Regions:
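Conserved core segment of the aminotransferase class I/II
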Residues: 217-285
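Conserved core of the PLP fold type I
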Residues: 47-187, 198, 202-215, 220, ...
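Short glycine-rich anion-binding loops that position phosphate/pyrophosphate groups of nucleotides
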Residues: 33, 161-164, 227
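A generic "structured core" feature
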Residues: 116-125, 153, 189-190, 200, ...
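N-terminal basic, amphipathic alpha-helical segments
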Residues: 1-48, 253-260, 268-271, 281-286, ...
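Conserved acidic functional residues
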Residues: 191-196, 303
Length: 391
């Protein structure tokens, strides 16, 4: 029987985070967004029209998601991410975590290699659904193929366009090596999470691994609309090669789709009428300006030794302040000034001893433009006296 993904109960608050919500003035966690950027007027108008004009949407829909939405997604992914698929290969679900739970059923008995550091929720979902995870330390090009071979895994979960949380982009030669690894033995598959691929500010993103391998290659492509629309808008999708698609359709034939049909059709109309592409373009420009403003404010108010990594893409970057006395001291000092962020070591599955010292992960997608100077000033007050090179 197919298994649902299960998210574990919240852990006790780590020592280097703040539990009192009232103390937080500036949330630099990576899951935050600026809700004022949500296209509420156009989205609401479409949804209202559907509510009154499409009563059939109250009925159960296609198990994979409504076909016209899947066609829009396939066209969008083909144009912007080079994904090679038809609408039939697209599966819509309520978040990547749910879709990973479905994949865990399809890959029962497998072992997954995961990036270290990496996205801890992915590891939790896979392991809670019976897929052991083996951490593989990334390098400057992403997940190393030799270490992947040594792991003994037949699945490989990667974020090649924008590694979370370091921001590393996997170059074309490493991508080709990864695809060769998957093709070398039957039963090997790559789970490609195209995290944050819409937000690349310096250069165009490389084509997806799925597009490089072809429609029936050994790659499952996953993406979400959480960052481009809102985290509370639980719409994600995966693209399955034909062999896996047939198993999915057989094993999940009795399952209803987990996304409201009104939400599906609203997104479909939003994409079909060009709203989505324009919204992404506006978001990309807005976040690029905020990234540049935040980086400039940090450099102006902090030690000149402060370094920023990963700012070229995604909605967060790594801040390293040599001689600060460790990431825990940095996180705690920031919390006293009302700023929430996490240390880099929190994203390690193991071997955090290899973690870059004095480094924290700072997301800026939840900051409004007018809050950037104050947030940077708060970090300046927190960290100015911590570095070995005081200004």
């Amino acid at each position: 029987r197919p298994q649902h993904s299960v998210v574990p109960a919240p852990k006790a608050t780590p020592k280097n985070t703040v539990s009192n919500q009232d103390d937080i003035l500036y949330d630099l966690s990576t899951g935050s967004i600026d809700t004022s950027l949500f296209p509420a007027r156009s989205w609401g108008r479409i949804q209202k029209e559907l509510m009154y004009q499409r009563p059939e949407l109250l009925q159960r829909g296609d198990m994979q998601g409504d076909e016209n939405l899947r066609a829009q997604i396939a066209a969008y992914l083909g144009e912007y991410r080079g994904v090679d698929c038809t609408a039939d290969q697209v599966v819509v679900g309520a978040g990547v975590e749910y879709l990973l739970g479905c994949l865990a059923h399809l890959f029962a008995g497998s072992t997954a290699a995961v990036e270290n550091p990496g996205y801890s929720r992915t590891r939790a979902v896979l392991e809670n659904n019976g897929i052991p995870c083996v951490p593989v330390e990334i390098d400057e090009s992403g997940l190393p193929i030799r270490a992947l071979e040594q792991s003994g895994a037949n699945l490989c979960y990667v974020t090649p366009s924008h590694h979370f949380p370091t921001g590393v982009t996997m170059p074309a030669p490493r991508r080709a090596q990864l695809l060769a690894w998957a093709a070398a033995k039957p039963g090997r598959f790559i789970l490609e999470d195209d995290y944050d691929s819409e937000f690349r500010f310096a250069t165009r993103p490389l084509p997806s691994l799925q597009g490089m391998s072809g429609a029936n290659g050994p790659v499952v492509y996953l993406t979400t609309f959480s960052k481009s629309l809102a985290p509370g808008m639980r719409i994600a999708c995966m693209v399955l090669p034909q062999g896996l698609l047939e198993r999915y359709q057989s094993d999940f034939s009795m399952y209803a789709n987990t996304v409201s049909r009104y939400e599906q059709q609203t997104l479909c109309e939003f994409m079909a009428n060009g709203y989505f592409a324009r919204h992404i373009a506006r978001m990309r420009l807005t976040y690029k300006r905020r990234m540049e403003a935040f980086a400039a404010a940090l450099h102006a108010g902090l030690d000149p030794d402060l370094t920023l990594a990963g700012a070229h893409s995604g909605l967060h970057f790594l801040l390293t302040l040599p001689g600060a006395g460790g990431e825990q001291a940095m996180v705690q000092a920031a919390a006293k000034q009302g700023v929430r962020l996490k240390g880099l070591s929190e994203y390690y599955m193991q071997d955090a001893a290899h973690c870059r010292p004095d480094t924290v992960v700072a997301g800026y997608s939840g900051l409004q433009a007018e809050d950037i100077p104050a947030a940077a000033a708060a970090l300046g007050r927190a960290w100015r006296q911590m570095s070995h090179s005081i200004i």
